[in-house]
């Protein structure tokens, strides 16, 4: 099921043609993408592959994979980025982004205090010159994909 005017559904409809940054890893129920508009390399988004707008809409099969994906991504981010920990956050409230998605954000040891905790969202919607480039996001995606075993 897809929804018109949904960015995530539009990307899913183009799945086979997506660049590495838009399909870091995936399975039948979930797709992992590198976040767009961020200045933080490795900021990932875990997306259900069908359109839902609330966590309670997950099927049991989707829910069963959710925790495993969050842990696997956190481990892979630690290996690839050297982060001390990861944040996992879900809102799905922004205009055009009501499709449920989980931010899996690497938190480096030297991240300034103003960007820790919920302040990390200050690293999204950055000016173009501050954003992780598509090429860099693709490189990170490939490294994470290799760490995850192509899952």
Regions found by a protein language model. Give the residues of each.
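HIT superfamily nucleotide-processing domains
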Residues: 1-151
